[in-house]
Curated annotation (Swiss-Prot):
Role, per record: Reversibly catalyzes the transfer of the carbamoyl group from carbamoyl phosphate (CP) to the N(epsilon) atom of ornithine (ORN) to produce L-citrulline.
A GO cellular component annotation in the UniProt record: cytoplasm
Family, per entry: Belongs to the aspartate/ornithine carbamoyltransferase superfamily. OTCase family.
Family annotation (SUPFAM superfamilies): Aspartate/ornithine carbamoyltransferase (SSF53671)
Naturally occurring in which organism (per UniProt): Neisseria flava
Annotated protein name in UniProt: Ornithine carbamoyltransferase
Length: 232
């Protein structure tokens, strides 16, 4: 829309990390372009690209973090909370091991927000990421709560976030395990009401399994009897 020249390199069109080192790819692309956005799996890949490209490198998503989504989420919460971010509370409920929960934890800590993670302990963010976030929160005045109680996590929250329970590339067999672990962490009208905040708002980075209007959604309904998974 802004008139920039854009090239999309799909996985099959690049030999990055396979037949060509990440360092060499970074150096070549850095001579051809003014910026690079990487959307893939390895956090180490985007960090190595940034080290050697010589131009700005943007993390569009990795397994560990999703910072560009955080710009959108911070703006949305600021626009719809009616108060400064450092006076805003939000909860993330669900599988908290991956990029969305990690990024929301770091975002909230940096902005001095009241952050709650509601998940089974086996699905909490890594101790390293939690420790880093707590250290930042001590400087910004932020608050961090990790709990296995979904209702405790959402109490008093202005926003409730969640994400998919099974990510792209994971086998179908993962669904049964996640449903067993996370069935008490679905975002439902009852969980929203448990916030005690009549103005609480729901956020999801999408795509969301919230009904039967997709092939996967219909399969989940036929297999597990659920009309919607992480949110309904």
């Amino acid at each position: 829309d802004q008139g920039a020249g854009v090239t999309y390199l799909e996985p099959s069109a690049s030999q990055i990390g396979h037949k060509e080192s990440i360092k060499d790819t970074a150096r070549v692309l850095g001579r051809m372009y003014d910026g690079i956005e990487y959307r893939g799996f390895g956090q180490d890949v985007v960090e190595e690209l940034a080290k050697y490209a010589g131009v700005p490198v943007f993390n569009g998503l990795t397994n560990e973090f999703h910072p560009t989504q955080m710009f959108a989420d911070a703006l949305t919460m600021r626009e719809h909370s009616g108060k400064p971010l450092n006076q805003t509370a939000f909860a993330y409920v669900g599988d908290a091991r991956y990029n969305m929960a990690n990024s929301l934890l770091v975002l909230g800590a940096k902005l001095g927000m009241d952050v709650r993670i509601g998940a089974p302990k086996t699905l909490w963010p890594s101790e390293n990421i939690v420790a880093r976030a707590r250290a930042v929160a001590e400087e910004t005045g932020g608050k961090i709560l990790l709990t296995e109680n979904a209702e405790e996590a959402v109490k008093g929250a202005d926003f409730i976030h969640t994400d998919v329970w099974v990510s792209m590339g994971e086998p179908k067999e993962a669904w049964q395990e996640r449903i067993d672990l996370l069935k008490d962490y679905r975002v439902t009208p009852e969980l929203m009401a448990a916030s005690g905040n009549p103005q609480v708002k729901f956020m999801h980075c999408l795509p969301a399994f919230h009904n039967r209007e997709t092939k996967v959604g219909e399969w989940i309904y036929e297999t597990f009897g659920l009309n919607g998974v992480e949110v309904t």
